[in-house]
Amino acid sequence: MTDHSSDKTALVLFSGGQDSATCLAWALARFARVETIGFDYGQRHLIELECRARLLDGFRAISDDWAAKLGDNHTLTIPTLAEISDTALTRDVAIAMGADGLPNTFVPGRNLIFLNFAAALAYRRGITDIVGGMCETDYSGYPDCRNDTIQALQTALSLGMARDITLHTPLMWRDKAATWQLAQDLGGDALVDLIREDSHTCYLGERGARHDWGYGCGECPACRLRAKGWIEYASGI
């Protein structure tokens, strides 16, 4: 379950969703200490943020080693992002595809802003390793999730802070089925069950409908990706 390959501390972008929970387990397997950061940016619901505390409690219950490694959990409020983002994640509007081929769930600059704030916090705390759940395999086409974007930002952050910053994206080339499998490899059935029960992916914030893969509306793009990945993972495809 653990791989003591580093005596360093990592900061994980931890939203309370499936991907960030899996990334947290990945970081706990590789770093001596792990801190987490989440963002209240005026999203239309706060379900994911509410899931964070339950997930962290679950991680501590799964492994004494993980419990010992888990450090501070930070939450930053960025209301300005919602003020300049007219999207389905920050407004009560129907999810639809735009003329540019992107769904209106895309919040322009969100990951760029998150990573800049995370890097600023990491700098103050002497951390140079930041972990995020960005992925360009099973994803909605968001340009700020692409590997080229992350690599460019890593260079910019390192130059701007005069410090070698490493942005780790362990899910970048994994589809959702492989992400479920990674959770299994890192924490066994206990971690998979925790992610199913207590993580949240649904864009609409639905927690009333329970599926094999967890809670959600089952219809939004995020739910469909999560469900498809679960079916493929569970069937061994």
Swiss-Prot record:
Keywords: ATP-binding, Ligase, Metal-binding, Nucleotide-binding, Queuosine biosynthesis, Zinc. One of its GO terms (molecular function) is ATP binding. InterPro entries: QueC, Rossmann-like_a/b/a_fold. Gene3D superfamilies: HUPs. Its EC number is 6.3.4.20. It catalyses: 7-carboxy-7-deazaguanine + NH4(+) + ATP = 7-cyano-7-deazaguanine + ADP + phosphate + H2O + H(+). Binds 1 zinc ion per subunit. Its cofactor is Zn(2+). The keyword GTP-binding does not apply. One of its GO terms (biological process) is queuosine biosynthetic process. HAMAP family: QueC. This is 7-cyano-7-deazaguanine synthase. It comes from Rhodopseudomonas palustris (strain ATCC BAA-98 / CGA009). The gene is queC.
